[in-house]
C-alpha cells in the first residue's frame, strides 16, 4: 500500500538567528523565527510524513506551547517523526521538496541538504529531491521577509 503526504511551512526572517534549512546552516545576515530552530524545510518534511499516515502535523506532536521544544533541533524532531512513521510499518518511496526564497541562493547548499535529509530518513540520497525557486520578487518571500517550503512524500508499506 502507498500513502502520499504533502507539507507546507513558512517562517519569517529575523536578525540575530542562524539560518538553518534542510539541516544545514547557510551563511546569511538573517535567520528564521520559530519556537524551535525554525528549519522551514525539515518542518515541511515532517508535516508531509505525518500527513501521509494521517497523524496530524508537527504542531500536534511538538506543540510550540511546550517549553521542551524551545530552540529544538528540527533534525531531532524529524528523526522522531520518522521513527513514528517506521513504527506504523512504512518506508520512504521518495521525497520531493521545494524551497521558496528570494535570498539567499540555495543552489550551493542543495546537495548537502539532500545528503542530510537522506541520513535523517535512513534512505538513499537518490530518493530525495530538493529544489529552490523564487517568486520573482512577489509576495512575502519576494520581499525577502521570510522563506516558504513545500514537500510531497510517497510512503510504502514495508
From Swiss-Prot:
GO annotation terms (biological process): isopentenyl diphosphate biosynthetic process, methylerythritol 4-phosphate pathway; terpenoid biosynthetic process
Key words, A-Z: Isoprene biosynthesis, Lyase, Metal-binding
Annotated site, Transition state stabilizer, chain positions: 35, 134
Domain of life of the organism encoding this protein: Bacteria
Pathway(s) this gene product operates in, as recorded in its UniProt entry: Isoprenoid biosynthesis; isopentenyl diphosphate biosynthesis via DXP pathway; isopentenyl diphosphate from 1-deoxy-D-xylulose 5-phosphate: step 4/6
UniProt binding sites for a divalent metal cation: 9, 11, 43
Transmembrane segments: none
Gene3D superfamilies from the UniProt entry: 2-C-methyl-D-erythritol 2,4-cyclodiphosphate synthase
Enzyme class: lyase
MF terms (GO), sorted A to Z: 2-C-methyl-D-erythritol 2,4-cyclodiphosphate synthase activity; metal ion binding
Cofactor(s) needed for function: a divalent metal cation
Cofactor, how bound (note): Binds 1 divalent metal cation per subunit.
EC identifiers of the protein: 4.6.1.12
Annotated InterPro entries: MECDP_synthase, MECDP_synthase_CS, MECDP_synthase_sf
Binding-site list for 4-CDP-2-C-methyl-D-erythritol 2-phosphate: 9-11, 35-36, 57-59, 62-66, 101-107, 133-136, 140, 143
Reaction equation(s) it catalyzes: 4-CDP-2-C-methyl-D-erythritol 2-phosphate = 2-C-methyl-D-erythritol 2,4-cyclic diphosphate + CMP
Function statement: Involved in the biosynthesis of isopentenyl diphosphate (IPP) and dimethylallyl diphosphate (DMAPP), two major building blocks of isoprenoid compounds. Catalyzes the conversion of 4-diphosphocytidyl-2-C-methyl-D-erythritol 2-phosphate (CDP-ME2P) to 2-C-methyl-D-erythritol 2,4-cyclodiphosphate (ME-CPP) with a corresponding release of cytidine 5-monophosphate (CMP).
Similarity comment text for this entry: Belongs to the IspF family.
HAMAP family reported for this sequence: IspF
Subunit note: Homotrimer.
Annotated PANTHER family: 2-C-METHYL-D-ERYTHRITOL 2,4-CYCLODIPHOSPHATE SYNTHASE, CHLOROPLASTIC
Name of the featured protein: 2-C-methyl-D-erythritol 2,4-cyclodiphosphate synthase
Amino acid at each position: 500500500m502507498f500513502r502520499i503526504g504533502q507539507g507546507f511551512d513558512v517562517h519569517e526572517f529575523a536578525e540575530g538567528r542562524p539560518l538553518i534549512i534542510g539541516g544545514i546552516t547557510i551563511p546569511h545576515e538573517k535567520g528564521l523565527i520559530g519556537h524551535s530552530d525554525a528549519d522551514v524545510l525539515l518542518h515541511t518534511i515532517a508535516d508531509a510524513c505525518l500527513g501521509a499516515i494521517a497523524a496530524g502535523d508537527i504542531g500536534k506532536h511538538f506543540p510550540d506551547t511546550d517549553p521542551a521544544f524551545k530552540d529544538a533541533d528540527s533534525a531531532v524532531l524529524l528523526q522522531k517523526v520518522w521513527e513514528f512513521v517506521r513504527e506504523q510499518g512504512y518506508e520512504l518511496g521518495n521525497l520531493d521538496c521545494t524551497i521558496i526564497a528570494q535570498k539567499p541562493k540555495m543552489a550551493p547548499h542543495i546537495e548537502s541538504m539532500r545528503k542530510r535529509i537522506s541520513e535523517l530518513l535512513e534512505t538513499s540520497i537518490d530518493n530525495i529531491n530538493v529544489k529552490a525557486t523564487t517568486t520573482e520578487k512577489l509576495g512575502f518571500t519576494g520581499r525577502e521577509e521570510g522563506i516558504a517550503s513545500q514537500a510531497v512524500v510517497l510512503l510504502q508499506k514495508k
